[in-house]
């Protein structure tokens, strides 16, 4: 559907995104159990995914000698955070933390940092598995653990990339594309249709965009008012209006953020299909696995899910049970790129796509395109909100511009961006 609003069914969507890809083996959590009553076909599918999860991601062979993690710092300035890692031999990497680090820094300092110190960074796959066991960290599963864990992983990958003289994409896979096509992600579900449309038009107008995602449903997350509901009939009005406004050449996606119950999700899914939307994201709550599967099997429009997921188990179940078309782990929420690559490889094993969710702010857009550039089964368009950020940096190999709907992927070592050293020096270490 790239560049076209012509309708497409689930199978056609999957074939298009996979055309240039090959199936990869993957790595991650091993030892998930196969239900005793599972059919032979299901047992075979689960076993295939488990085998995929056993394979490593980081290219250890690029580093002949141990890379011992000597220090791991969390730095702050004006309520924003950086992570800086240094090896025993003096190599350094820096990442930009998610905006919620102001609430999660104790987990970084007390639950995660002690486990990483003294470890060989070449063992990053194993470290990311075992840190969940240390200090019963799995009890904190979800964004509370995933966000600080990803922040640490990004800094280590940046360090390793600089040591190897390679971009992060070449550490976790093979560069599949020099540019990543993006869609404009919009919000404003709480606003009337006319105001929403005006804001959507303004957002799209800022960049050379050929794909757009809108919000549907009435998830009122932005208020403490327990009786708050969205504008009546907003979804039914805005879906056809957005198609009419942007025409058939704009690829459209829709995101409900888990708002609907199954019957309403079916109804809205049919509406989206009528107006040639390319997928329906989080139609029901992310962990309602059986409902997600039912939607995927009953609706022709592809179903996307995984932004909120925090373990491999949900993806494993949905993929094994033919219950999901597009996997959407978030680089930050899910605990980093290596874990996200493992999900991508699971999806590839059954011909499914990955379109990662992207957290806004910081350098999330560059982290996301590095990941996507390494994935053979990446979908057609990937999340983008803007280049606005508090971070002071230079991008010598990739301009901050969307050109013909695409962002150039940095090719420099690490994440390919250079933080302003004077700005970094202004940050102070967070004490545990």
Could you tell me what each predicted segment is?
Residues 2-21:
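N-terminal secretory signal peptides and thylakoid transit peptides that target proteins
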